Curated annotation (Swiss-Prot):
Protein's membrane topology: Peripheral membrane protein
Annotated Pfam families: Phycobilisome
Cellular-component GO terms for this entry: chloroplast thylakoid membrane; phycobilisome
Function noted in UniProt: Light-harvesting photosynthetic bile pigment-protein from the phycobiliprotein complex.
Keyword Cytoplasm: no
Post-translational modification: Contains two covalently linked bilin chromophores.
Keywords in alphabetical order: Antenna complex, Bile pigment, Chloroplast, Chromophore, Electron transport, Membrane, Photosynthesis, Phycobilisome, Plastid, Thylakoid, Transport
InterPro entries assigned: Globin-like_sf, Phycobilisome_asu/bsu, Phycobilisome_asu/bsu_sf
Primary gene name: cpeA
This protein's name: B-phycoerythrin alpha chain
Cellular localisation: Plastid, Chloroplast thylakoid membrane
Highest taxon above the source species: Eukaryota
Binding site for (2R,3E)-phycoerythrobilin 2: C139
Length: 164
């Protein structure tokens, strides 16, 4: 699984060298931010059901046509699948926060997602809207500390950019 630490070590090993001072500084910064990442992961895990519901509701409010016949949310089963997908992405963001890297999203969430959604006629813009809603709804310090919010938002931005 990719993280700052595994990336630095892999690059150093591939070059047949020890990690450089800048490599170690990068790792140090990552470790210093770990408390904020873990706070964000804890807050997300503790509120994930509400986060997913609000994100999904916002998506269907913005893209009401998705509930029309022939669309991605034409019946309750398909609507539930959309909420399930949002939940899946939030779990992967949580895992990214825990490991301190984008490995979980890269390996389990992004690789091939656009192609799958295109094949199934599911608009990625709807998922992007739900994730952006979560990012934009975040309120510091109500939801988490400022640094935890920065860490959480960074992974949401990464996911938004990957699906866009």
């Amino acid at each position: 699984m990719k993280s700052v630490i595994t990336t630095v070590v892999s690059a150093a090993d591939a070059a047949g060298r020890f990690p450089s001072n800048s490599d170690l500084e990068s790792i140090q910064g990552n470790i210093q931010r770990s408390a904020a990442r873990l706070e964000a992961a804890e807050k997300l895990a503790g509120n994930h059901e509400a986060v997913v519901k609000e994100a999904g509701d916002a998506c269907f409010a913005k893209y009401a046509y998705l509930k029309n016949p022939g669309e991605a949310g034409e019946n309750q089963e398909k609507i539930n699948k959309c909420y399930r997908d949002v939940d899946h992405y939030m779990r992967l963001v949580n895992y990214d926060l825990v490991v301190g890297g984008t490995g979980p999203l890269d390996e389990w969430g992004i690789a091939g997602a656009r192609e799958v959604y295109r094949t199934l006629n599911l608009p990625t813009s709807a998922y992007v809207a739900s994730i952006a809603y979560t990012r934009d709804r975040l309120c510091v310090p109500r939801d988490m500390s400022a640094q935890a919010g920065v860490e959480f938002s960074a992974y949401l931005d990464y996911l938004i950019n990957a699906l866009s």
